[in-house]
């Protein structure tokens, strides 16, 4: 990795001799790509992908991984992710009668409304301070994913005992399960109407966006990362997923792993 945040690739034959004019292409799970050809020294320098933090802690220094998340907080996450991928400023006006333009979440909700990521209620409210449920969050994640990928809902089934085929989010849950984003419970249920926790949120989002924490880098560089007073070590099951989500970093993404380079 150079000081300009570029990834260096060197090719050689079995005898260690440099190989020039080798075409190389890198592509991560977000479909960011870079390609080029090695020079006379067998070297090609390509940029690494930037993963921006999309979730933050609280003013008291905590993250509160097992707390629930509000619908407004969920909207903020997806707005940040879309803004990052599209290179747009987060702004927009919503038509929900309970979303004041003076609230911190107004632009986030307005921005997502433009892309059809969020749904309100029949009385034109959004209920920003209500907890977002597991099913609601999964549905939002699938809609977000469909902005950048060909999502074929309705092509999959799911066997959670509490998710009937006529459940409003059945096709979303089935798609997310097929994509590998979800874990249910040991008793075979999904509990879609339960409030989702902040730890569960980052786990789903990381999987849906192809972000995989580099545990080795994190362990060696804890002093450089954002710290939370209630997450001082890796004893919490979502420690690494939270580190991935809450720290902006450069990374080279492989099929089932990610190498942080800054």
Question: Where in the sequence are the language-model features?
Answer:
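Beta-strand-rich domain onsets/edges
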Residues: 1-15
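Short, ordered, surface-exposed loop/turn motifs in non-cytosolic proteins
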Residues: 15-28
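Glycine-centered tight beta-turn/hairpin loop motif at sheet-sheet or coil-to-beta transitions
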Residues: 29-33
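Feature responds to low-complexity, polar/acidic, surface-exposed segments characteristic
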Residues: 35-72, 79-106, 115, 119-135, ...
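Membrane-interfacial amphipathic helices and adjacent loop/beta segments
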Residues: 180
């Amino acid at each position: 990795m150079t000081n300009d945040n570029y990834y260096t690739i060197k090719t050689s034959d079995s005898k260690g001799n440099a190989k020039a004019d080798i075409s190389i292409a890198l592509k991560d799970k977000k479909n960011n790509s870079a390609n080029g050809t090695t020079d006379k020294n067998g070297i090609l320098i390509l940029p690494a992908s930037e993963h921006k933090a999309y979730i933050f802690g609280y003013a008291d220094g905590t993250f509160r991984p097992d707390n629930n998340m509000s619908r407004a907080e969920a909207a903020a996450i997806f707005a940040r992710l879309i803004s990052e991928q599209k290179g747009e400023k987060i702004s927009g006006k919503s038509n929900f009668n309970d979303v004041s333009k003076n609230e911190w979440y107004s632009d986030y909700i307005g921005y997502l409304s433009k892309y059809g990521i969020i749904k309100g209620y029949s009385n034109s409210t959004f209920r920003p301070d209500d907890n977002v449920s597991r099913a609601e969050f999964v549905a939002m994640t699938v809609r977000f994913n469909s902005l950048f990928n060909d999502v074929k809902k309705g092509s999959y089934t799911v066997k959670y005992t509490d998710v009937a085929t006529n459940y409003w989010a059945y096709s979303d849950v089935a798609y997310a399960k097929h994509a590998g984003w979800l874990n249910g419970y040991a008793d075979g249920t999904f509990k879609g109407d339960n409030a989702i926790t902040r730890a569960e949120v980052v786990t789903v989002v990381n999987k849906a966006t192809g972000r995989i924490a580099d545990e080795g880098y994190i362990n060696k560089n804890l002093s450089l990362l954002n710290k939370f007073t209630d997450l001082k070590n890796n004893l919490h099951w979502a420690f690494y997923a939270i580190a991935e989500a809450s720290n902006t970093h450069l990374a080279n993404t492989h099929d089932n792993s990610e190498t942080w380079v800054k």
